[in-house]
Amino acid sequence: MKETIVAQATAPGRGGIGILRVSGPKAVEVAHTVLGKCPKPRMADYLPFKDSDGNVLDQGIALYFKAPHSFTGEDVLELQGHGGQVVLDLLLKRILQLEGLRLARPGEFSEQAFLNDKLDLAQAEAIADLIDASSEQAARSALKSLQGEFSNKVNQLVDSVIYLRTYVEAAIDFPDEEIDFLADGKIEAHLNDIITQLDHVRSEAKQGSILREGMKVVIAGRPNAGKSSLLNALAGREAAIVTDIAGTTRDVLREHIHIDGMPLHIIDTAGLREATDEVERIGIVRAWSEIEQADRILLMLDSTEADNQDLEKVRSEFLTKLPSNIPVTIVRNKADLSGENEGIVEQNGYTVITLSAKTQQGIALLREHLKQSMGYQTNMEGGFLARRRHLEALEQAATHLQQGHVQLTQFYAGELLAEELRRVQNHLSEITGQFTSDDLLGNIFSSFCIGK
């Protein structure tokens, strides 16, 4: 018989309420042993919780959920008593004395919910993300993932891929049926539609990943542009040494901050110039390494220097050398010395913010800009949360879609296109964990009258 698991569902320590959760075939037996009866399904019952000698350990609310109508899909019993840890430990010890009961592993209740098709993998992960959410936006987005918004988008993509595979494999396996879908433009049009759909989901998932894991912001620029002063201003403390000596920062400095609950990883780097010694050279190499891994780059300019007044000169010196796929915000620092007013404008496709890191003038504008860059929305109607593994799976799927497009349009290779689509489907299924090869087989026989 399958084991029954039990664990404390509330955080350890003192509290108003403490909850033990039991899941498995012996949940009813636990109820009769500890409560003297099993409550009616989905009905709260106020009862004493007793030890093996019949002595009352505590009294509280008991809830019973009969399979499959429970979180795990199994029989579930919840005992909600007072939040004293000693009482909860005694009650847990009593339950574990029963044969066939064991302590649950971390996350095992959610695992059972997944195995019993109550949740897919993305939804199960969203439970942890909801618990760990550091902002209202993150919590709402995690809830949307838990409710299946991300999974639904992935499943729609999978359905589209299966539909296309159905046609392609029919053309390969049943040529006598005069199904020659590779000969017209319908397959390519449908493939292009899937590529477009996937690009939209990838964009949303990347935003959701930043919201969950934090945006990596790298401060870059010439020496003595005020990069370390900006790090200190954003961090709200003296995290970096600031002097008038160019090249003070030799190594990478990191600060983890929150703006209205939105997590940011701020990276201060060595000034970009021709190195004067080996230590500075190593620091500059590390700076470029951080730049290449950034989610956003803050390019610091000294607004008192004449060369920085011309954006074209800045473009030739810095912007053309920065990774083209990473968004760049130009920060004109030292407004207190140049006499410029704080402000934010769009110029030649770049956001340009004028501020003074020393006096904090304009820092609020930068904070708001970074917050909006992470997807912060005042109406809290943002999308779903996503993890790095989701992004990797979507990236792999996109790669194989593009390879499939090449096989179709350049080589007219139906077998290779079908193989690329199979790989796309497998990578997408890694997100939800719901794919089986029987899905495709059933689709072929139900969609076509082969042999008619």
UniProtKB/Swiss-Prot annotation:
* Positions bound to K(+): 224, 243, 245, 248
Q: Which domain of life is it from?
A: Bacteria
Look at the named UniProt entry and state the broad enzyme category this protein falls under: hydrolase
Q: Which cofactor does it need?
A: K(+)
Q: What is its EC number?
A: 3.6.-.-
| Co-factor binding comment | Binds 1 potassium ion per subunit.
State the compartments where it is located: Cytoplasm
What processes in GO biological process is this protein linked to? Answer: tRNA methylation; tRNA wobble uridine modification
Q: Name one GO molecular function term.
A: GTPase activity
* Protein residues bound to (6S)-5-formyl-5,6,7,8-tetrahydrofolate: 21, 78, 118, 452
Return the InterPro entries for the record.
G_TrmE (IPR031168), GTP-bd (IPR006073), GTP-bd_TrmE_N (IPR018948), GTPase_MnmE (IPR004520), MnmE_dom2 (IPR027368), MnmE_helical (IPR025867), P-loop_NTPase (IPR027417), Small_GTP-bd (IPR005225)
Binding residues for Mg(2+):
228, 249
Name one cellular component (GO) term: cytosol
The family line of this record is: Belongs to the TRAFAC class TrmE-Era-EngA-EngB-Septin-like GTPase superfamily. TrmE GTPase family.
Could you tell me what this protein does?
Exhibits a very high intrinsic GTPase hydrolysis rate. Involved in the addition of a carboxymethylaminomethyl (cmnm) group at the wobble position (U34) of certain tRNAs, forming tRNA-cmnm(5)s(2)U34.
Q: How does it assemble?
A: Homodimer. Heterotetramer of two MnmE and two MnmG subunits.
PANTHER family attached to this UniProt entry = TRNA MODIFICATION GTPASE GTPBP3, TRNA MODIFICATION GTPASE GTPBP3, MITOCHONDRIAL
Under what name is this protein listed?
tRNA modification GTPase MnmE
- Organism listed in the record: Pasteurella multocida (strain Pm70)
| Gene designation per UniProt | mnmE
